[in-house]
């Protein structure tokens, strides 16, 4: 259970509070403003972020009561949604973003993301999370 707690720590902090926040604050608004399929994709990704956060909360609750069967089911659900989410994000959503956001705006977005990462360096420190994973 201690290893699962460490994975949950990474999911809560890096995935939800850093990675998802950057997408929702800096990338998805452009797609939503574009409308059409781009907006639908961005909204679907945001909905999936909420599902992932819900699974994080469920996992935390079940870790606290040491419900191994439920923890196993939640982890299975995590694998399923993260697998499809990452595939869709990398193969479809970011392709639309690449096309939809002009070069000038991309520079602005990248600067804003860089500033966000500096302001949230504790949450967005990939090396810290890689170290935790390597220790598992």
Regions found by a protein language model. Give the residues of each.
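Small-residue-biased structural context
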Residues: 1-136
């Amino acid at each position: 259970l201690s290893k699962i707690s460490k994975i949950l720590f990474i999911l809560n902090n890096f995935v939800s509070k850093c990675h998802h926040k950057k997408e929702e604050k800096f990338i998805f608004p452009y797609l939503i403003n574009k409308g059409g399929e781009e907006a639908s994709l961005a909204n679907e990704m945001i909905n999936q972020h909420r599902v992932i956060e819900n699974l994080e909360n469920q996992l935390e609750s079940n870790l606290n009561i040491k419900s191994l069967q439920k923890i196993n089911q939640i982890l299975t659900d995590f694998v399923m949604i993260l697998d499809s989410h990452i595939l869709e994000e990398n193969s479809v959503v970011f392709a639309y973003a690449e096309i939809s956001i002009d070069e000038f705006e991309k520079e602005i977005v990248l600067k804003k993301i860089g500033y966000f990462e500096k302001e949230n360096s504790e949450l967005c420190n990939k090396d810290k999370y890689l170290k935790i994973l390597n220790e598992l």
